[in-house]
Amino acid sequence: MNSVIIGNGESRSWFNPEIKREEWVDIETWGCNAVYREASPDHIVAMDYAMQQEIYDSGYALKNNCYFANWNVVPSEVAEMTLMGYDIPQEFIHFNNRQKPTEQCVIQGKDPNTLKEKIELTIKKFPNLDIKDLTLKMEKDVGIWITYVEETDQVTPIVGRNGYSTGNAAMSLACESGS
């Protein structure tokens, strides 16, 4: 079987969401991030916490194959205990849009206090990087992301691909699946 990776932003400019799925015979489709808004590929891959939460909130992950990085389901009580005793500004706490918490959740995040240190370390290691671009990308998704989940969702945790971009993770997963 062949695979097609539908990338992000400009890298998906070639993609026409009007193409009917039936026309892609023997082709497995892997979409990145927000492509779910305009199409329904066989699989969606997301590495960023905010995008994962958006996909989950849309209901897409309840009916479609999704692959999310750092996706570890824990009892919901863990979320409450995680927030106890910390003075975390509200702008750094991101809950998904569920009216009522479920019995399980996923807790992810980036500590804004250690972020500057990580940026400086990365710049030392890779001095030729565009510092402005690096900072913009690393500051993305700062805070705690708490997503209450359903037991019947279609999310598969991405394992062993820390540091991959979404497109690279999608290609790796497609190869691993044998397509």
Task: List the predicted regions and their residue ranges.
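N-terminal glycine-/serine-/threonine-rich phosphate-binding loop
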Residues: 1-29
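Acidic/Gly/His-enriched mid-domain segments of enzyme catalytic cores or analogous surface patches
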Residues: 19-178
